[in-house]
Amino acid sequence: GPEPDAGIYLRGTPQVQIWDTARTNVGAEVGSGGLYNNQQNPSKPLKVADQKVGEWNTFLIRMIGERVSVWLNGELVTDNVILENFWDRSQLIFPVEQIELQAHGSKVAYRDIFIKEIPRPEPFKLSSEEEKEGFRILFDGTNLDQWTGNKRDYAVESGNIVLHPSQGSGGNLYTKDQFDNFVFRFEFMLTPGANNGLGIRTPLEGDAAYMGMELQILDNDAPVYEKLAIYQYHGSVYGVIPAKRGFLKPVGEWNYQEVIADGDHIKVILNGTTILDGNIREASKNGTMDKREHPGLLNKTGHIGFLGHGSKVKFRNIRIKELK
C-alpha cells in the first residue's frame, strides 16, 4: 500500500519493524527487521535485506529471554539484541504475552505463519534438606520478581542471571527484601578478568563497599589484577578482611559459594573450602586495612546485591536462610 509501515509485536511489545526502504523521510532506508522502539539497545538492522515492494519477504524471528535475533530473507539483521519494554522501560520485557501483527493504515499481507516454542529451563528447586532447614529461593532461573535495581543489564537467560554491562559499569541488582543474619547460597561463573561483588546489609544507594559491606567476586588470577592489595582478592570483605586464595574454579566453570552473616561474624565458603572466617568489628576496631571510612560496615540489616564493575558474569540457583 501507500507508504507501507507495519511491524510484529513480540510478547505484546513493539516491534520488529516492517517498512518501505524508499521512505527516506522517516529513516526507512536502514531496512526492515530492526527493533524500532529500542532506545538503549540497537534499534536498526545490521543491513538492508528487503525485497522490492510487492514481493514476498521471509522473516525468521527467535526470542530467548529478553533477546531477539531476526533473519530477513536469510540475512541476519538483528543479532541477539534486548527488546526493551516499550510500555515501562524501567522493567524487563514481559515473560509471556501474545504475538501481534500490526499495520499503520497501509495495506500489508502476512502468510505462512508458524511458531515453535523453545522449552524454558526447569525452575531451580531446593533440596529436601534445604527445605527442612528453612531456605527460600531468591532466584529460580525464571524471573527477577524478587529483585530491584538494574534489570536492563542483568537479564534472565537460560536459567541464569547474566550481566551484560552496557555502559561500562553494569550497575547493581539488589534483593527487594532486607536481611540481617543469614546463610546465602549461590553459584557464579566468571569471564576472563571479571570483577563483580556481593553486597550485604547494604542500602540501595551509595557505594555498597562502604555504605554496607562488599564481598569480592573477582577473577583475581587475571594479569590485570597482579598488583592487588590483599583485601581485594575474591571472597574478601573489601578493604577489611582478606580471604584465602587459590580455590576458584577456572574461568568458564561454575563456582559454588556460601556466605554466612551472623552478627559481626562473616564466613565465606567457596567450592567447599572456607576462605574467610572473621569478625568485622574486631577487624576494624583500630581502623580498616584500606584506611578508609566504612560507615555501613556494622549495619544490622540491608539488601543483598550483585555489584557490577563492567564485566560479564553469570549467577544461578540463589537461595537464603534467615538466622534467628
What feature does the model see in each segment?
Residues 1-324:
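Carbohydrate-interacting regions of secretory-pathway proteins
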